[in-house]
Amino acid sequence: MILAIYLIAAIVVLGVFFLLLSSAATAYLKFRGTRLVTCPETKEPAAVEVDAKYAAFTAPIGEEGLRLKDCSRWPERQDCGQQCLGQIVSAPEDCLVRNILTKWYEGRTCVFCGKALGEIDWLDHKPALMSPKRVTLEWNEIPAEKVPVVLQTHMPVCWDCHIAETFRRCYPELFVDRSSKPRESHQSS
């Protein structure tokens, strides 16, 4: 009888622990990553990062405690009221920079080879951009608050072409452009 009570108590404790852990993990995953918001003070784009650990810590106690961990306007405006958090609460997925970029790449093709970019692999071979000066860039080279301007002026580039163009730019003496030479046939006449 006592063993059954201990077993039931252990199951209840584990269930509550699982619910609290689940709530914390959900909040952490929901609020991690760099986001693009319109600064209420300047009406300009600003890159912000929510303190996802704090959000995860406060989620199990029933309050969604959001605060900024970083902002592109800091340290000058570090004491702002953080009113931009309202934009994140109302549309957490829409302001995530990764999602903005994913939507922009949808249906686009590489400016060099014409290959459809398809689903983006953000961990391995992510696509790049070509600037108006015909220089390819990776996303980590562009400040997040500049994304709206960059998306209007740059063209999509697949990973393979980005690597080839970077090699061509960095090592021009080692690059041989064979596209202008006629192809030789390997078939015997």
Map each language-model feature to its residues.
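Acidic, Ser/Thr-rich low-complexity segments on the non-lumenal side of membrane proteins
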Residues: 38-79
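Short functional micro-motifs and their immediate structural scaffolds
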Residues: 44-47, 76, 89, 115-118, ...
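Short cysteine-rich clusters marking metal-coordination/redox-active sites
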Residues: 39, 68-71, 110-113, 158-161
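Short Cys/His-rich "knuckle" micro-motifs
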Residues: 47-51, 120-124, 166-172
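Short cysteine/histidine-rich metal-coordination sites, predominantly Zn2+-binding motifs
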Residues: 52-63, 86-93, 98-103, 125-139, ...
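Transmembrane-cytosolic junction motif
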Residues: 15-44
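Short metal-coordination and nucleic-acid-contact micro-motifs, chiefly zinc-binding Cys/His arrays
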Residues: 32-35, 67, 103-109, 151-154
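Feature marks short, highly hydrophobic, charge-poor N-terminal signal-anchor/signal peptide-like helices
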Residues: 1-10
